[in-house]
UniProtKB/Swiss-Prot annotation:
Tree of life domain: Bacteria
UniProt xrefs under Pfam families: DUF1054
Family to which the UniProt record says this protein belongs: Belongs to the UPF0637 family.
Lineage: Bacteria, Bacillati, Bacillota, Bacilli, Lactobacillales
Protein name: UPF0637 protein LCK_01372
Length: 200
């Protein structure tokens, strides 16, 4: 078990300092714990992988509505390449394979072609998987091939758009004492790995 239901209480704190203190003391250690499990799995592809825990350094007034750890084969950063993210909102934990707007415009044409090439594998993902078009907005839709194709098209044509696919674990799932999130997280990474190999 990585996360617990009580961890979500961090988002009840409405001040910037209070929430940041909670993120640093409660959630970030969970991300560090998760990295010890995930990095060996990712490194099976022969690359050196690194964990990047969100710092929220640009926040001056409003507290962050979500926080995350990103995994990428680059020590300096992750936003300019396809990467994995495990994050937390006030109502769920998410595990995504992410292609974000920072890749534009330099890599737009290349990554769009790669995402299009991966669509058949996307179609085989579990029906429980979701699609997000903005990692900073708590809004998703079912990961259908139609939704995926539209998201890729929007990514190609719109400056502020992203493609994130994966699994959400709802806060309510943690109410069950026997629930084990580690298994779901690991299984999601494994399910997304073949797609990553195409779009990386």
């Amino acid at each position: 078990m990585i996360f617990k239901q009580e961890d979500f209480k961090v988002f009840d704190e409405q001040t910037l300092d209070g929430r940041m203190q909670g993120i640093r003391s409660v959630i970030d250690p969970k991300f560090e714990q998760l990295a010890k499990v995930i990095l060996p799995l990712l490194s099976e592809d022969g690359q050196a992988w690194y964990a990047h825990i969100a710092k929220h350094l640009r926040r001056t007034t409003n507290p962050p509505e979500n926080t995350w750890v990103a995994f990428a084969p680059n020590k300096r950063g992750y936003k300019m390449m396809p990467h994995y993210e495990v994050g937390m909102w006030d109502d769920h934990v998410y595990i995504y394979l992410a292609v974000e707007e920072n890749m534009k415009p330099v890599s737009t044409q290349k990554i769009v072609a790669q995402m299009t090439k991966a669509r058949e594998l996307v179609a085989r993902l579990p029906a429980t998987f979701t699609l997000s078009q903005d990692h900073m907005v708590n809004k998703t839709e079912p990961l259908t091939l139609t939704h995926y194709d539209l998201a890729v098209q929007k990514f190609a044509e719109t400056k502020h758009s992203e493609v994130l696919i994966g699994l959400q674990i709802m806060k309510s799932d943690y109410e069950t004492l026997s629930f084990e999130d580690t298994n779901h997280i690991m299984a999601t990474f494994k399910a997304l790995r073949a797609i990553y190999e195409i779009i990386k």
